[in-house]
Amino acid sequence: MNETGDLFAWGEVQPKTEFSWESYQWCDGSKDGLTKYNEADGKRQLETEDDAAHVILGGKWRMPTPKEYRELLNNCIQTSYLTYKGTEGITFTSKINGNTLFFPMRPETTFTGATSMTGNCWTSSLDGNTGGYNDPYFPIVLQRGIAMDIRNMDPLNLIHLERYEAAFIRPVLPE
C-alpha cells in the first residue's frame, strides 16, 4: 500500500488531484485574478482557516514557515533515499539531536518528458522577498532525477511554485 499523502494547492484545505488556475480556490480563474492573499487584502501569511495542517489535524498543528524550513536546511543532512511502508522518500537527520525526518516523494513528469521523484512541501506564507502578490510561494523541494547521481546532490532547497500547483504539507506542532 502506498501512503504518499495528499496533495494540496497553497491555501486550500481539501486535497485534490487536478491543479490549475481554473480550479484554484483563491482566484477567478487566472493568476491575475487573485481573490485572497493579494494586494487588496495585504495578507501574506495563511489564516488558520486556510492552513490545511491546522484544519485537518486541529489543535496547534500548522504548516511551517519558510524560516522553519531554513532551519531544517541548516541543521539536517540528507541521510538516504528509501522506501518506507511502500512509499518512496528521503530521510534527513538532525545534526543537533540525531532525530530523523521522512519526506514522501511522488513521480512527476517534467516539461521535457523526463521522470523524476519530487516531494514539494508548502510553507505557510508568501515569498516576501520578491514583491508582488502574484509571485509564487516558498515550498521546500525534494527532487531526484531518475538518472541523476545523488551522492553529490543537495536536494533540499527553497524555490517558488505557483500557488495552484500540487505540493504536500508537512505539519509542525510548536512546542
For every predicted segment, state its role.
Residues 1-24, 28-51, 55-62, 66-175:
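C-terminal, surface-exposed recognition/capping segments
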